[in-house]
UniProtKB/Swiss-Prot annotation:
Tissue: Expressed in most tissues with highest levels in kidney and heart. Overexpressed in the majority of common human cancers and their metastases, due to the presence of intratumoral hypoxia and as a result of mutations in genes encoding oncoproteins and tumor suppressors. A higher level expression seen in pituitary tumors as compared to the pituitary gland.
Biased composition regions of type Polar residues, renumbered to the chain: 494-517, 652-669
Protein name per its UniProtKB record: Hypoxia-inducible factor 1-alpha
Organism: Homo sapiens
Residue positions where Phosphothreonine is found in the record: 555
Compartments (UniProt record): Cytoplasm; Nucleus; Nucleus speckle
Modified residues (4-hydroxyproline): 402, 564
GO molecular-function terms, A-Z: cis-regulatory region sequence-specific DNA binding; DNA-binding transcription activator activity; DNA-binding transcription activator activity, RNA polymerase II-specific; DNA-binding transcription factor activity; DNA-binding transcription factor activity, RNA polymerase II-specific; DNA-binding transcription repressor activity; E-box binding; enzyme binding
Residues modified as (3S)-3-hydroxyasparagine: 803
Effect of residue 400 to A: Abolishes VHLE3-dependent ubiquitination
Alphabetical list of NCBIfam families matching this protein: sensory_box
GO biological process, one term: vascular endothelial growth factor production
PTM entry text: S-nitrosylation of Cys-800 may be responsible for increased recruitment of p300 coactivator necessary for transcriptional activity of HIF-1 complex.
Length: 826
């Protein structure tokens, strides 16, 4: 039993010793291995602080890479470096805008420069010996393998196999925008422009003695240049660089001004144009592929290409393009390009595109351009030379025809003074009814003929606070439009007869009156002395000269085709609008054709009844002499009446008219009541009651306040008939106080309007006033005011037409009654 137990103890001791020896041997091997790796690490061309911290795998990886590089370098024909080249080696990497990377045919990075940390954030020792596929974008692996492949097939004669490589590679970057380093797991993709070539190294020269032939060594040597983002460009751009922005279809949306100095283009002429229009044709394929890579990988560098200049030739340009993405939806928004012009304009006399021919070819002048230049020349040309030029170009004659909408300027060839003609053309009085008269003295006659309003005459408003008898409600009805108050009509000439030299001289010498009271018409001196027409001219100043072109009518105009007025009653006869024909036919002397209708009236009265006229003239002259100068203040400003349309509306809208029947078309406005006449005669006794009623002063009188005689007179006037030889007057004015013989009431060529103003007075009893109205061609009336704001009834053309006097004198004052009435008035 004891022997068996001792044997077991010996076995245990021997196994423990073997295990210990095995552990010691393994420890010895590891220590030796560590020593070998330590020695190997120190054999690598690395700094001591780096090599001392390498693990075994890193030492093996770096050693293998070093051996491959050594093999690569031994295969090449390397010159012996002198001291100068050794000193310059440190500047090569600084001159490069990237790092150097050497790849094997299987993608291992056997060499990478130490400045890779500056661009990618990863150190040289972390990348050397690793596969490039571990640090590149998965979408770029296929392209990377294609770039590493070297085809050894047969090459066509005259062609060498292309070993140049240029591609874009997205690689992991641990650098932030602020230059800090992040974890490799949080790295972003950075686009590298890799350019280089494939080297094939034949190692048969170092063939061992055993006779084994090694395959040639293939490697790809690249210079990797990262593309900076436009927002991170630190170096300021020089004068040979310009910025541009494009849409996704590569059309210009912005361009820097420096392109004008470099290539001749203006930034405005490039907007909206595609950049493909300015590429050289030989570089279009390369740039098309580059743009495809830009949209795929986000950034590209075009390399050097030719871009056409404006006036011919081209320049070499290198562009860095970056796709700008929307921060909200990460969709591409635009493209920003940094263009580096690396040369001047080459072959500037050579044309490569149609855009360059626009600056070389002369523009063809069309006939339209020639005609424009012909008429816009500053120097004046003779009309004969102008005709010769137009004759040589018949196509240009069509441009002389006026088109629709062209302004036609009438030329005045009567004057030789150029300056005065220009001034007249500048001051032609257009629409003088609303414009001020021209200050030019040469245009005074034109203004007088064109303007219906006198220059110093200001239309008074209809409503006045100084009128106590004005009803506010009536004023509102009678003043719908203030513009109608500014319209006026003047009396046209009776005949189109050339004025006498005396008339012409009078018009030229006499200035335009400042007020209507200064209006006057001139007659013979004997008639002035006999009738004292100065008072009449101021009382009834009526401009008989045609100044309104719209109201001027020819007396020979036949108005037979106009429809006559047909009332609803059957007691009216149809008659024609034969204006002033009896007046013209009865004129026997040249003086009767004068524009002054008042003179004609006086002349006709003298011819028809010499005896009665003498009596009337004597009575009228005596009465007019009694008028004192202080009573002339009662004569107010002459204000023209509105149009007959307004008068008709006012007539039909009278509120208290005695003819209020809706079916009666002969209703006339209200007449002034006795209260107004009483107030007038009490305030100014023994004075001529020659008054005019303005449109704003018409008052409404109830029917019960009207005198029965006035009602009888108005009813009689409604029933009168029109004679075939009676004259129709479209405008009525207040005439002078004249007496008409009773015998010639039917044969007189002028129809007189008589209105009787009756009043009952305690002292004088019943008084009658006869107002004789002078005929005119237009609807105008004389409006005036007295000191006590009273007035006479208003007579319109409507009253003249309907209430014309008839034969018979049963309603007219005759003989002594007329003289008595005149005495009472005065």
């Amino acid at each position: 039993m004891e022997g068996a137990g001792g044997a077991n103890d010996k076995k245990k001791i021997s196994s423990e010793r073997r295990k210990e020896k095995s552990r010691d041997a393994a420890r010895s091997r590891r220590s030796k291995e560590s020593e070998v790796f330590y020695e190997l690490a120190h054999q690598l061309p690395l700094p001591h602080n780096v090599s001392s911290h390498l693990d075994k795998a890193s030492v093996m990886r770096l050693t293998i890479s070093y051996l491959r590089v050594r093999k690569l370098l031994d295969a090449g024909d390397l010159d012996i470096e002198d001291d100068m080249k050794a000193q310059m080696n440190c500047f090569y990497l600084k001159a490069l805008d990237g790092f150097v990377m050497v790849l094997t045919d299987d993608g291992d990075m056997i060499y990478i420069s130490d400045n890779v940390n500056k661009y990618m954030g990863l150190t040289q020792f972390e990348l050397t010996g690793h596969s490039v596929f571990d640090f590149t974008h998965p979408c770029d692996h296929e392209e990377m393998r294609e770039m590493l492949t070297h085809r050894n097939g047969l090459v066509k004669k005259g062609k060498e196999q292309n070993t140049q490589r240029s591609f874009f590679l997205r690689m992991k970057c641990t650098l932030t925008s602020r230059g800090r380093t992040m974890n490799i797991k949080s790295a972003t993709w950075k686009v590298l422009h890799c350019t280089g070539h494939i080297h094939v190294y034949d190692t048969n020269s170092n063939q061992p003695q055993c006779g084994y032939k090694k395959p040639p060594m293939t490697c790809l040597v690249l210079i990797c240049e990262p593309i900076p983002h436009p927002s991170n460009i630190e170096i300021p751009l020089d004068s040979k660089t310009f910025l541009s922005r494009h849409s996704l279809d590569m059309k210009f949306s912005y361009c820097d001004e420096r392109i004008t100095e470099l290539m001749g283009y203006e930034p405005e002429e490039l907007l909206g144009r595609s950049i493909y229009e300015y590429y050289h044709a030989l570089d279009s394929d390369h740039l098309t592929k580059t743009h495809h890579d830009m949209f795929t990988k986000g950034q590209v560098t075009t390399g050097q290409y030719r871009m056409l200049a404006k006036r011919g030739g081209y320049v070499w340009v290198e562009t860095q393009a970056t796709v700008i993405y929307n921060t909200k939806n990460s969709q591409p928004q635009c493209i920003v390009c940094v263009n580096y012009v690396v040369s001047g304009i080459i072959q500037h006399d050579l044309i490569f595109s149609l855009q360059q021919t626009e600056c070389v070819l002369k523009p063809v002048e069309s006939s339209d351009m020639k005609m424009t230049q012909l008429f816009t020349k500053v120097e004046s040309e003779d009309t004969s030379s102008l005709f010769d030029k137009l004759k040589k170009e018949p196509d240009a004659l069509t441009l002389l025809a006026p088109a629709a909408g062209d302004t036609i300027i009438s030329l005045d060839f009567g004057s030789n003074d150029t300056e005065t003609d220009d001034q007249q053309l500048e001051e032609v009085p257009l629409y003088n009814d609303v414009m001020l008269p021209s200050p030019n003295e040469k245009l005074q006659n034109i203004n007088l003929a064109m303007s219906p309003l006198p220059t110093a005459e200001t239309p008074k408003p209809l409503r006045s606070s100084a009128d106590p008898a004005l009803n506010q409600e009536v004023a509102l009805k009678l003043e719908p439009n203030p513009e109608s108050l500014e319209l006026s009509f003047t009396m046209p000439q009776i005949q189109d007869q050339t004025p006498s030299p005396s008339d012409g001289s009078t018009r030229q010498s006499s200035p335009e009156p400042n007020s209507p009271s200064e209006y006057c018409f001139y007659v013979d001196s004997d008639m002035v002395n006999e009738f004292k027409l100065e008072l009449v001219e101021k009382l009834f100043a009526e401009d008989t000269e045609a100044k309104n072109p719209f109201s001027t009518q020819d007396t020979d105009l036949d108005l037979e085709m106009l429809a006559p007025y047909i009332p609803m009653d059957d007691d009216f006869q149809l008659r024609s609008f034969d204006q002033l024909s009896p007046l013209e036919s009865s004129s026997a002397s040249p003086e009767s054709a004068s524009p002054q209708s008042t003179v004609t009236v006086f002349q006709q009265t003298q011819i028809q009844e010499p005896t009665a006229n003498a009596t009337t003239t004597t009575a009228t002259t005596d009465e007019l002499k009694t008028v004192t100068k202080d009573r002339m203040e009662d004569i107010k400003i002459l204000i023209a009446s509105p149009s007959p349309t307004h008068i008709h509306k006012e007539t039909t809208s009278a509120t208290s008219s005695p003819y209020r029947d809706t079916q009666s078309r002969t209703a006339s406005p209200n007449r002034a009541g006795k209260g107004v006449i009483e107030q007038t005669e009490k305030s100014h006794p023994r004075s001529p009651n020659v008054l005019s009623v303005a449109l704003s002063q018409r008052t409404t009188v109830p029917e019960e306040e009207l005198n029965p005689k006035i009602l009888a007179l108005q009813n009689a006037q409604r029933k009168r008939k029109m004679e075939h030889d009676g004259s129709l007057f479209q405008a009525v004015g207040i005439g002078t106080l004249l007496q008409q013989p009773d015998d010639h009431a039917a044969t007189t060529s002028l129809s007189w309007k008589r209105v009787k103003g009756c009043k009952s007075s305690e002292q004088n009893g019943m008084e009658q006033k006869t107002i004789i109205l002078i005929p005119s061609d237009l609807a105008c009336r004389l409006l005036g005011q007295s000191m006590d704001e009273s007035g006479l009834p208003q007579l319109t053309s409507y009253d003249c037409e309907v209430n014309a006097p008839i034969q018979g004198s049963r309603n007219l004052l005759q003989g002594e009654e007329l003289l008595r009435a005149l005495d009472q008035v005065n």
